[in-house]
Amino acid sequence: MSGHSKWATTKHQKAVKDARRGKEFAKLIKNIEVAARTGGGDPAGNPTLYDAIQKAKKTSVPNDNIERARKRGAGEEAGGADWQTIMYEGYGPNGVAVLIECLSDNRNRAAGEVRVAMTRNGGSMADPGSVSYLFSRKGVVTLEKNSLSEDDVLTAVLEAGAEEVNDLGETFEVISEPTDLVAVRQALQEAGIDYESAEASFQPSMSVPVDVETARKVFKLVDALEDSDDVQNVYTNVDLSDEVLAALDED
């Protein structure tokens, strides 16, 4: 199972608790705006918007902010920006692969901020295609365990196209092809299982084990990248053992 997923879960829990909360809110709001602009402002007919709103609600974004973002994206209210998705590729400490997904209204600013964060934290930019081939676009649904077993989840989602269910400690992660994401999410809902988020994400096709020191350096790089308002998501191919995760949790 992907150490990056366990890491991402830990990072999300920390983000909700600390000063990064405001930045997290801003990124979720941007997702809603883009989803509404791309597929229309009605969540019932726009699964991407539905899922963007669900994730924002689960992260405690105020309903007023969610509704205003939906209206801006749908053109019902003025003020929506022309957000563009831009992908950057690079290498982190010890040659770890890094894929950076930006959502920006200023390509030059985004490129500059990504480059500065990389070079100041032991990373380097890479040519397009030199890193992205190490990742696959997947549908990812995360849900809190509560009293569920892995078999409970698997039974609910198997026929909907789920490929695997990963145990991430306090949560489960259901992986599918992006085209099966909505079916998997709906299968969970029909089984009466609540979920935290459902979104398309990049998953490493092969993960690289790293020691604690390298993990700390990669963590520092990812944090620096995510500090940019233009950066939505950062993906790496690190594989963190339980021992390394435990050491990181103590930091």
Swiss-Prot record:
Location(s) in or outside the cell: Cytoplasm
Region (Disordered): 1-20
GO cellular component: cytosol
GO biological process, one term: regulation of DNA-templated transcription
One Pfam family hit: Transcrip_reg
Molecular-function annotations in GO: DNA binding
Keywords: Cytoplasm, DNA-binding, Transcription, Transcription regulation
Gene3D superfamilies: 1.10.10.200, 3.30.70.980
Top-level taxon in the UniProt lineage: Bacteria
Family annotation (InterPro entries): Integrase-like_N (IPR017856), TACO1_YebC-like_2nd/3rd_dom (IPR048300), TACO1_YebC_N (IPR049083), Transcrip_reg_TACO1-like (IPR002876), Transcrip_reg_TACO1-like_dom3 (IPR026564), YebC-like (IPR029072)
Spans traversing the lipid bilayer: none
Family to which the UniProt record says this protein belongs: Belongs to the TACO1 family.
Protein name from the UniProt record: Probable transcriptional regulatory protein MAB_2888c
